Structure formats: C-alpha cells, structure tokens
Regions:
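A short beta-sheet element
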Residues: 58, 62-112
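Well-ordered mid-protein domain cores that form the structural environment of catalytic cofactors
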Residues: 108, 112-113, 121, 141
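A short glycine-rich beta-alpha junction/loop motif
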Residues: 84-90, 125-151
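DNA target-recognition patches
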Residues: 9-49, 87
Length: 165
C-alpha cells in the first residue's frame, strides 16, 4: 500500500459563512468539546445576536484555535449529522475540499489520535493564550493511502465502534 504525502491545506478549505440572515436559531447553536464532539452550548445566550455565528454544514469541521487549559487536547468536532449548526465566531470552520483524495471521516480519525493532540499543542503559539492557527493546521503534512483504502479503514473503525456499543 503506497502512501502519498500531502499538505493538509491543499485538501481542506476554510469556511467563513456567517449566519448573517438569521436562518439558524438558538436551537442550532453548538459548542465543541475536548472529546471531539459537538455539544449543546453552555453559554448564556440571552440577548446574543446569532448573525456573526459561523455556519457548520453537514460534513464540516469546527475547532477552537486556543489550546491553553484544554487538558493537552484540541477542541475539534466533525458534523456527522444531516443538520446544520452554528458556532461562535471564535471557532475556525473548514471542510474537505479534495474529496477524491481525502475522506472526511478518515481525517476525523486522524484528528482523534493522541498524536494529533500532541502535534497541535506543540505547534500552538503564544504565552498566556496559546493558539493552533489555521496556518498551522494547513501546514500539517499527512501521509494518505488511496481514497478506497481510507474508506475501508473508516468502515472497519465504525464496525468496531458499533460492536463496542
């Protein structure tokens, strides 16, 4: 099985779509956790305008670039539902744009590895507030098998998860 090295930034695209028309409401607001899942927001949303919130469409990712005080984990989640969410403008939202090269579920498996948490912490910059920037995310070098092999790995992983539940 041959692997090909890519820069992640060549395979993903930043999304800056905002909820500018208030299409999405309070029930669509989510947060992400260090368990790498979307969660209900814990913020007091009373009187908060949702127009600057970023749109997280199905199959999109959202992460918090600030890595300080996160238990050495990065806060990132993959929208694996058919629903569209909105997140605070402090998040970075992106999607896999080269779907013929990279499977989004395979990428999420990559993000769930402890090695990725260590990588993102090591490449976070700042003093009081360390940040894993979009540029650092794009600079990641990732070795990928063919898209068919990626999909097989994802299928095996999901089958293992289903057997555990």
């Amino acid at each position: 099985m041959a692997l090909t090295k890519y820069k992640l930034g060549d395979l993903i695209t930043l999304s800056e779509e905002k909820n500018s028309e208030n299409k999405y409401g309070i029930d669509d607001v989510k947060g992400a956790s260090i368990r790498k899942i979307f969660i209900e927001t814990k913020a007091n949303m009373s009187g908060v305008s949702l127009t600057p919130y970023l749109v997280v469409k199905p199959d999109y990712f959202a992460y918090v670039p600030v890595t300080s005080r996160n238990g050495n984990k990065i806060t990132i989640a993959h929208n694996e539902t058919n629903n569209t969410y909105i997140v605070s403008s402090s998040y970075i939202v992106f999607y896999v744009s080269s779907t013929e090269i990279l499977d989004s579920d395979f990428l999420f498996m990559y993000f769930n590895r402890p090695e990725f948490d260590r990588y993102s912490r090591y490449h976070s910059w700042g003093s009081a507030r360390e940040v894993f920037s979009w540029n650092e995310m794009c600079a990641i070098e990732i070795n990928l098998p063919s898209i068919d092999i990626q999909r097989k790995y994802v299928a095996v992983f999901k089958a293992l998860l289903a057997n555990n539940n």
